[in-house]
Amino acid sequence: MLQRETKRSKFHFYGTSSGAIRAAAFAQAQPEAVDRLVLVAFTYKGTGSPTLRDRAKQVEFYRANNRRTRDRAMIRSIFTRDNLASSYDMAVADAMADEELKFGDQVPTGTYLDMTANLPLVDPTKIPSPVARIRGDHDGIATMGDLFDFYRQLPNGDRVFISLPNTAHSPGFANNRHLLWYATHAFLAAPTPVAG
């Protein structure tokens, strides 16, 4: 539908956290449809991740159950787990919980199982598009080493790695979210490189 309505064959894609894994997997599977790709709060192999180490303690639960609890405490923990709660206005976490919980307090376990037992889900060598890798400098979902391992294998030289200061796992909700939007806009609006 997008191709039909816009008459375009390629599009920019943006994903954050498990959505970043999905966006990268799409870019790997359908590279002809991806113009520029922005991956925020992404994890590659999970090597050294304190968040995934804690989450892995429940891997057998994730294998045995197709749903997990996502209650108010869990939603608030997204904003506090990286020991930088001061980078958020917790009223945002509460507003998010208020809206999400209208639809229930259960979500599929699939992404948690994938992140604790099935990484890596994406092969960076199979993503030919330009890529922006953006992370909060306090994000516990992935280490810098894990992310640089992914970044260095990307085949396209049109790539950037951006670390946002005083920011944790959810930069789009953080007090410094303007830095995320600035970096994203700059990358998506970049001129097309001229071949040498």
List the predicted regions and their residue ranges:
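Conserved acidic catalytic loop of the alpha/beta-hydrolase fold
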Residues: 1-10
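Alpha/beta-hydrolase-fold serine-hydrolase catalytic core, especially in secreted/extracellular enzymes
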Residues: 157, 189-196
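Alpha/beta-hydrolase
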Residues: 48-134
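Catalytic histidine-centered segment of alpha/beta-hydrolase-like enzymes
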Residues: 167-178
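Conserved alpha/beta-hydrolase "acid-adjacent" motif
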Residues: 140-146
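Short, amphipathic alpha-helical "lid/cap" segments that border enzyme active or binding sites
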Residues: 177-185
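Conserved hydrolase catalytic core segment
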Residues: 9, 14, 18-47
